[in-house]
């Protein structure tokens, strides 16, 4: 007799479809909000990932995809999506001066005003639960007073000329500061019809819009009469001369426009960017190669030593040698920064006492790079040592016994047996280590901050900067403004370079071992 297995209430199809339906409605609501805010890329990404997830978990035929979907969704959200955004920004002029859309930049400019009339001193006086606004003309000595009003929203106050002083004590600067936004929304109308608004914490003045938008999209400065047109090549409203050519004046804020390959060509044509970029690229490759070589060499040698059968206290040595890996890297880096201090660091004190020298670790390019390699080797060798310790267990003892019978010594065993058998399984990990050190942002940022700085460059660049640090400084530390478009272009080039180097290394390794 067949046994029908009873389902629990939480396993019912009705509950499943109800939950999926609610999730679908929530996702649809979020997508509509993103689209309404102009975040089209976020809206499309959310729609694709959510729709795929709902389909996979609702369809029995896609059951196997339930195990793959979380990983693929995570990769798409945290790897592919930022990559696409970075590449998209690289083809724009997006920067600290060009962050807004054209419509928003135009709106900001049209909201600006200028003082076009008299300036009046004002006072704020309590009238029970309400307030009265008093204006005084310093030139004529006339005083004006409003009826009692309450703060809240935009409002127009009709003022009357008066000779009597308002009752109550005049509000101090603290009260005016607390109600500054409400006062800014007030338009005071004088008996002659002139309108004045708050221009400072103690004054009202006549204001007019600074710019007027003409029918052809031209902005006219009402104060100077200069005309401006949107220049979509640079993303700014730019002045135009009498003969219709572009002038020198630009209005901020600018707006974001597509610039094509301009940011990429700047990297290779602007000498102020090209020279530091090429020099930093070479240093980045050299730094990564030397670091990988030294960490593997030190880690492999130490792994062989702690695996030596005749060595006593091997467990203690293993723990001590692995300690640098257990300490968070940023703590070790900051400790080394103090140890390498040129004036008070223990390393310079020791070198001065023994050899009479005090290297300029932070001001000389060569010694600064040497310091970086020393610190990075210290941080990286424990990882390689742990890997080699595990791989050494897989080497048969028969090989060493046979070599001993042939009269081979420790060095011959290492170079003829140990190294060839370890290097092949270590190769993928060495490539991964190379890629990691190629983008080792934290080490440079905490230890040297890219210094010492290079002179004569268009963008901020240092002798110890890696490409990723150079990109960061362009994006967030540029003296002439944050240039996100150029930084995104360099980040895209870094991605292509690291990918190309990894492919070349993998192919070279495959050819070698095939």
UniProtKB/Swiss-Prot annotation:
The gene is malF. It comes from Escherichia coli (strain K12). It is a multi-pass membrane protein. This is Maltose/maltodextrin transport system permease protein MalF. PROSITE patterns: ABC_TM1. The chain crosses the membrane at residues 17-36, 40-58, 67-92, 276-306, 319-336, 370-392, 426-452, 484-505. InterPro entries: MalF_N, MalF_N_TM, MalF_P2, MalF_P2_sf, MetI-like, MetI-like_sf. PANTHER family: MALTOSE/MALTODEXTRIN TRANSPORT SYSTEM PERMEASE PROTEIN MALF (PTHR47314), MALTOSE_MALTODEXTRIN TRANSPORT SYSTEM PERMEASE PROTEIN MALF (PTHR47314:SF1). Belongs to the binding-protein-dependent transport system permease family. MalFG subfamily. GO terms for molecular function: ABC-type maltose transporter activity. When MalF EAA loop mutations are made concomitantly with MalG EAA loop mutations, a complete loss of transport and complex formation is observed, except for the Gly-407. This suggests that the MalF-MalG interaction may be important for the proper assembly and also for the correct function of the transporter.
